[in-house]
UniProtKB/Swiss-Prot annotation:
The gene is trm44. Keywords: Cytoplasm, Methyltransferase, S-adenosyl-L-methionine, Transferase, tRNA processing. It comes from Aspergillus oryzae (strain ATCC 42149 / RIB 40). Signal peptide: none annotated. This is tRNA (uracil-O(2)-)-methyltransferase. It catalyses: uridine(44) in tRNA(Ser) + S-adenosyl-L-methionine = 2'-O-methyluridine(44) in tRNA(Ser) + S-adenosyl-L-homocysteine + H(+). The keyword Methyltransferase applies. The lineage of its organism: Eukaryota, Fungi, Dikarya, Ascomycota, Pezizomycotina. Residues 480-493 have a biased composition (Basic and acidic residues). It is an enzyme of class 2 (transferase).
Length: 635
């Protein structure tokens, strides 16, 4: 679905056209004191809305942690307290993260970050139903400080014929009040409206006996706020209030009721592998440590900020992923910050098609042993430290099935550059970031490199290519039959829980998620992603997909082998015996499955030998360079 972040969804013909201060009136819902007067405006009200209160409540819960949707200056909001005990705090997420991975529980935050909620005010006719304390986290902590905020939820249900409702209709009301933890207006950061408190009120006149998301009733959403005494209302604040109201309505249109605690807009493929706050905190640290210098010294023809910050975001994810899998931590945390101070717990990485080498550089600087290769040397390599340059190789990957096929015809021709067949060291973690021709090869090369213990990997697809290297658009995956007894593997990592009964809400939720996936997989990028997943699963990988928080629309990460490797590494650390299995049989099975997939996928290009010839010819062109706009990565 297209993003209409800035689209106006309100009926602007109902607005007065006057400056907001001229339209203010006392709030009839929130009563203040002689020095605290809540106000609202008819220009801050939108009526005729079809959403039942449950939709607004669901959306409000979702926005509690995803405040970045309302402000580009913010990363997120961390939940510090929930009176219902439903939303997890960062400490609770870290503890769960440590228990399922190889992170030591002792390395998580020692104690809960306790912030007492502001006492809730009584609101006539309403019942207080929930209190949440959150901390707003800015994108630039050196410019803006975090801010705690108490959120109070109130509800009212007025029966037909009661005061405030008509004889025929029931009035249901939902009120959310947000109060920052500040002693004066000078403490309010730039990203927060200069207000003492802000409230959303949603009134729904329900004419239907049974509620639906678009029932026969009608709703009205209004904003109420508590300004500072004698403080003028600047134009910026007026724009902010209108934008907040508009965003709430726009998002409500796409909100589907959900049984999840995070709200109906929650994406099950986002933050499902690593907690959001861990990755973003690490990203902030890396950005301030490396971002400025890398952008300043950039020598490529491409835009530096896009590539630098994307690579730093991926690096942050990898650091936290490896913390979970291996118990490996950055050099700063080991008091060994500096070149070539590698964590002995980490087995090493290889960045295939490493491009500008920034990912390799930062990972090495952070204390993770590894190297990268690309078919063509980049100008950026020469500005990196010498020890990093030594680990960036100008080499072409020729898959072993191709070298074996060409061996019968005199071997691989001289390409004028070193070649290799991907025989990486045991336990090496493979990074395949926008590797184009190598994307679908990634799980295959990981298995062929070490069939007795296939290597773990992450692939971030970009441009679509066949195994021959030729550009190819994969067809969308076939939809599973409705009466199929087994669940389609492509959805296992999206939602592993199936409705235990014929509950309509649960069935509806499953149907919506399936429809969302179908739409994604019909695209070229979605079909490529699914192809990488299906190949990996076919040859024995337990695959997870996760939406990475990177500045790119090609942001789906396909992770293979994480769970198995995490379990194996935990057993090693605890000096437990390895699981009893027939190693030769496992190796032979993995090789057979990989070769069967290679032969099938290469059949469209004349078999393995024909695909090998295409691969070599394309590799020559990539090595020589094809001019700006046609090089790898310019899809």
């Amino acid at each position: 679905m297209k993003n209409h972040r800035n689209k106006t969804v309100r009926d602007v013909t109902k607005l007065s056209g006057k400056p907001l201060p001229e339209t203010l009136e006392p709030s009839s819902i929130l009563q203040g004191t002689p020095t605290e007067q809540w106000v609202t405006s008819k220009d801050l009200l939108e009526d005729g809305l079809p959403f039942i209160p449950e939709v607004m409540k669901d959306l409000t819960v979702f926005l509690l942690g995803n405040i970045n949707i309302n402000s580009t200056h913010l990363f997120r909001a961390d939940i510090l307290y929930d009176s219902q005990g439903v939303l997890s705090t960062p400490q609770q997420k870290e503890l769960s993260f440590a228990q399922t991975g190889n992170t030591s529980v002792e390395t998580t935050t020692d104690a809960e970050d306790r912030v007492e909620p502001i006492v809730a005010a009584e609101v006539a006719g309403f019942n207080l139903t929930r209190t949440v304390v959150r901390r707003l986290i800015p994108r630039n902590p050196k410019l803006d400080r975090p801010l705690e905020q108490t959120c109070h939820f109130y509800e009212a249900d007025i029966a037909p014929g009661s005061e405030g409702a008509t004889q025929e209709s029931r009035l249901r009301r939902f009120l959310a009040v947000y109060t920052p933890h500040v002693a004066s207006k000078e403490e309010i950061p730039f990203y927060h409206p200069l207000l003492r408190a802000l409230a959303y009120l949603y009134d729904f006149t329900d004419d239907a006996a049974e509620a639906t998301e678009a029932g026969s009733g009608s709703g009205a959403l209004s904003l109420h706020f508590l300004p500072y005494p004698e403080e003028a209302l600047p134009t910026r604040l007026e724009r902010t209030l209108h934008a907040l109201l508009n965003t709430q309505i726009r998002l409500a249109r796409n909100t589907r009721l959900s049984e999840t605690t995070e709200g109906g807009n929650y994406n099950p493929s986002k933050d499902n592998v690593i907690p959001q706050h861990l990755v973003q905190n690490t990203y902030s640290r890396l950005k301030f440590k490396y971002g400025k210098d890398l952008c300043r010294d950039w020598v490529e023809d491409t835009e530096p900020t896009k590539h630098v910050f994307e690579d730093l975001a991926i690096t942050a994810f990898l650091i936290e992923l490896w913390r979970s899998m291996y118990g490996a931590v950055p050099g700063e945390e080991r008091n060994e910050d500096g070149p070539e101070k590698y964590d002995p717990n980490f087995p090493g990485f290889v960045d295939v098609a490493c491009g500008n080498g920034v990912l390799v550089y930062v990972l090495l600087m952070e204390g993770y042993r590894g190297w990268g290769f690309d078919a063509r040397r980049r100008k950026t390599w020469k500005i990196l430290p010498e020890f990093v340059q030594a680990r960036l190789k100008e080499e072409i990957y020729i898959p072993k099935p191709f070298t074996d096929a060409m061996a019968e015809r005199g071997g691989v021709p001289d390409l004028g550059v070193e070649t290799h067949s991907g025989l990486f060291e045991k336990d090496t973690f493979i990074i395949s970031n926008h590797a184009d021709e190598l994307t679908v090869w990634t799980p295959l090369m990981a298995t062929l490199a070490c069939p007795e213990s296939p290597l773990p990997f992450i692939a971030i697809p970009c441009c679509s290519h066949a195994l021959s290297g030729a550009k190819y658009r994969y067809p969308p995956p076939k939809a599973s039959k409705p009466d199929s007894d087994k669940e389609s593997s492509q959805h296992e990592d999206v939602d592993s829980e199936q409705p235990a009964t014929g509950d309509l809400k649960a069935l509806r939720k499953a149907k919506q998620e399936a429809q969302t996936d179908v739409g994604f997989y019909k695209s070229m990028y979605g079909s490529l992603t699914m192809k990488a997943i299906s190949i990996a699963e076919e040859i024995g990988y337990d695959v997870e997909k996760t939406l990475l928080r990177i500045p790119s629309t090609r942001n789906m990460g396909v992770i293979g082998g994480r769970k198995r490797v995490t379990k194996e590494w935990r057993a090693r650390n605890q000096q437990q015996p390895a699981s009893d299995c027939n190693g030769d049989a496992v190796t032979e099975s993995a090789l057979d499955k990989a070769m069967a997939a290679v032969q099938r996928e290469c059949s469209r290009d004349g078999g393995v030998e024909g695909a090998a010839k295409i691969w070599v010819e394309r590799a020559k062109g990539i090595h020589k360079g094809q001019g700006p706009g046609n090089q790898r990565g310019h899809c």
